[in-house]
Amino acid sequence: LNALKILYVSPTRALVNDLFRRLVDPVTYVGVELGRKTGDRSRLDLKHLPAVLLTTPESFDSMLARKPRVLQTLSAVVLDEIHLLDNTPRGDQLRILLGRLRRFHDKLQYCALSATIDDMDIGARYFDDAKVCFLKSTREIEYELIEQDDFVQKVFRAAKQRGLKKILIFFNARSLAELFSQKFNRPPFHGAVFVHHASLQKQRREEVENRMNQGEIGILCATSTLELGIDIGDVDCVVLYRPPFDISSLLQRIGRGNRRTNKLFALGVYTNTWERMLFETYFDCAIKGQLFEKRYQPSLSVIPQQIYSYLYQRQRIGTTLQSVYNILLPVYTETQVRTAFKRLIDDGKVKENRPGIYFDGYELEEKIRWGKIHSNIADVAFGEYDVISTESNRLIGRIFHLKHRFILSGRCWETVRIVEKEKRILAKCIGDSPAVAKVFEGKGEGNYSYMLASVLKQRICPDMDVMEFPITFERGNTYILHLLGHLYGFIIADALSEQSQDASDAEGKILILNHHVLAGSTFPIPEKEAIKKVIRRNIARLEDALGSGAYFYDLPIDMQIEDHYLNLDIEGFVEFLSLIRLVHIDLKGFQKVINSLKK
């Protein structure tokens, strides 16, 4: 036929390659040709097109901008693992790409696949008349939690007791995956221990995947890159070294194990009582199907990227601002598009060759040549900083937000130097924090949804109502246990400080109002304008933490602030805080609540 009939869009090149390996034989057997197009395999033979093409959002963007005629023969579009793209810049990019495709081909069938779903409207964002079909899993989740001390030996013991042949271990940092791969490389797994993370060369990653797939035994130490559905064979057990970032991430990770049975078995490794409670909460919510995903908000950084891509598609004749509105308005407002467009003209990234007719500017030539205008992928480091003591040169813990003075591990610290490239802070101890603020000796977990705070609080204070949170007073100071995590904890404290309230956050768990005794039972909610000022001061660090897209800085500053404001779901966050009722307990009782997490 030499005509493309099905476009199968998958989130990553690795997933495309894995799907190709698994599908090429059965699909070819029934007389259908299967192809793939990714950044690694960018060439497409126009004289010999496959009937089914596996690709990524970025390569789909490239085809639409550079070879749109290839897509005119399509009958169907399949969106794989849509939950990994939705509510991200790449998800909004895909939404607009599908709209651009429909402008010249509106007779298409759509299908979206998702391993987890928390938002019933997810399909409607990508195509009309979306119907949700649930295939309820009968897979039972079994898990054990173990302390970090000597956990390598504990994993070996579990392997012996349960007859585990293949084990997948997830770490939240590449350095830990490398370190522990050496510690696991001993009998009975000597020579069969591998590492998998994004920094490895593609050939090495594929070699590791093949060896795990084909070998009879093996341990694979990996990072979040293996949360995706890459086929590494039948894994008997998934080990999670410290809690993942959220419940969806936990489900993705444990879902990699026991794929050919009806039971999932996982081991969670915790370093302190707080992490144990996080694990228990995550697993409990996962079993109940409660994911606590953040509410959908459009990513504004996609506006400039899609303008560049569309202008390239129209490079011969140019396009009008109205045409740009037409492709973007289903997702963004006219004001947002017009404001961003003006900034691109002012910066020379869009040029007006004839009155009202626009083209990509010379500033973009290199990005066009290398295909960079088709990607919204930006490097993300989750915005956390290692805190190193200047006295001992040891790692004290991790914090999200940088302040000159802060509380960590129950002590007060003063920043001496920030090493931004290495995400490190050198700090000196300036004394113990108040007794009531000596909270958790953790490493700074706190990327979960603010809505999870009430669930965590119920585990600590089961006798309180769901939206009741404890408050106490000591020496003219106010202490509120909020458990909102580092991200929202620092936003509250800094925004209140912006309003001349001396406020600080203790490890994303306690709000401290210094020299102020709070009256009433209402949570102290900062004004939204104060929150926006905090966002403005922390544009770069929040961009790093939130993953705001590759073209975030092509937006004007006010839109950068708005993008963070939307990404953080500040409207929903403020609404959540307004539902909290503070319940006073005496200092001794408050300390008892805190100590319950240290047992």
Label for each model-derived stretch:
Residues Q297, L321, I327-L329, E334-I377, ...:
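Extended, highly charged accessory segments
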Residues L108, G215-I217, D246-Y296:
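Conserved segment of the helicase C-terminal RecA-like domain
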